[in-house]
Amino acid sequence: MNFQRPNANDATISVNRSRSVVPQSGLCSRCVDGCVGNCEVFQATFRGRELIYPGPFGSITAGADKDYPVDYSHLNIQGYALGGEGLADGLEANPDTCIFPAVNVQTEYGWDVKVKMAAPVFTGALGSTEIARKNWDHFSVGAALSGVTLVCGENVCGIDPDLELDCNGKVKSAPDMDRRIATYERYHRGLGEILVQMNVEDTRLGVAEYVSRKHGLETIELKWGQGAKCIGGEIKVRSLERALELQKRGYVVTPDPSDPIIQAAFKSRAIKEFERHSRLGFIDEEGFLAECDRLRGLGFKRITLKTGAYALRELAMALKWGSKAKIDLLTIDGAPGGTGMSPWRMMEEWGVPSIYLHSAAVEFADKLAAQGERVPDLAFAGGFSSEDHLFKALALGSPYVKAVCLGRAMMIPGMVGKNVANWMNNGGLPKTVSQYGNTPEEIFVCWEQVADLVGKDEMKNIPLGAVGIFSFAQKLSIGLQQLMAGARRFSIPAITRRELMSLTKECAEVTGIPYVMDAYRDEALDIIES
């Protein structure tokens, strides 16, 4: 069985000429001399390194489509005909109390100082990619109104054209970071938070010091990695001057914009863009614990950690060291991941897939707990988009997982809402939207709820993408309530691993979740044999 065929994908705007394709190579079974394309090898003939990345940069997000032997679709959710766990104090389970709107989907995370969220979901890291920058108002206001945490990703200060550094090379003024934080905080309603992520370059630039000193942020996130790639973050730059500026700030920029040969190729328009890369991080226990102490010394109340689809060794380090450092939330992001810009073939072929990585995380967390060590609050990430995914991740990771990180899925409603506004302004709503109406009040089912939160007069300042994210978050919450009610679990802490069953023996082996014909079999036989 072939799990992923290379050499042609919509992400790289490429396609095979032939309908007959060699599964492993992705080459047409009959490659014709004279073919006009348009597979990846054809395009790489004259565009070379540009074919490494999905595109066009700044207009898309991309998600790898490798079909793994086991994934979350191999789990199904149990339903019961009696019971009601996790009801509010004093309530007895009966048909009048056990209704799905009564399900409490609020959650919280943190070692000592907790953060409450309206739903067990938060955004992926929205950093220096163009898709994050230009849609920030939609994403941030939407997350704030929805009562969930927003992660401001890496390199935001480092790529700011208006960045000012002091005499020590540290951030003195970062207007784009200021804008991002202010936008979220303006509509923050006491649930969720904004936290800023740091990588190697951010640490060197003193980003933590800046956001603590100027904005008084309570949480900072250390980034070890992500599911989409095992190298540092990337963006594309389309001017020589900008490439040289970022190189001067300490970033790795390729091809080298200071090379006269590269400059000549850029001026002749053979080279049309440059890539800005972040450095690989290096971790060790002593350094990690010391950095956590340093950040707390700056005034941060919470420190979170994001790790990617690395080998199980690194997963164990994140859990063990995170426990020692009293990390407030550990986000574990499995392959294949989604991105604003990552190497496409790396996305497809590297890393431990989500369900394998998450299953190992639970195994290791159980061992830590059995040793008497406290497990940090966990969040799972990697390929989630719907309410059933939330339930499955929370159940698989019970009792450690408190929330699920949604990357691309949380961005899409922001972009769609923005585009609805653009279409209305241009008088060209597509039928997929106009079937519901021609004004925001008609189109957005949650318009009045958002207006109730911020006030009618303030709605003129609310971007439609934010209303879109609020609507999507509502769909997730209500859908999760229904699934939880069917499983007779009326609060997030009440969800257990028993609420899942494996549809295949291989899934049962990977996850430790019983095969469908074994789940609850003992209880069933006790009834039959009674």
Describe the function of each predicted region.
Residues 1-119, 131-144, 149, 161-192, ...:
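Conserved, well-structured core domains of diverse proteins
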Residues 193-203, 224-228, 271, 278-285:
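Active-site beta->alpha loop and helix N-cap motifs at the rims of alpha/beta catalytic domains
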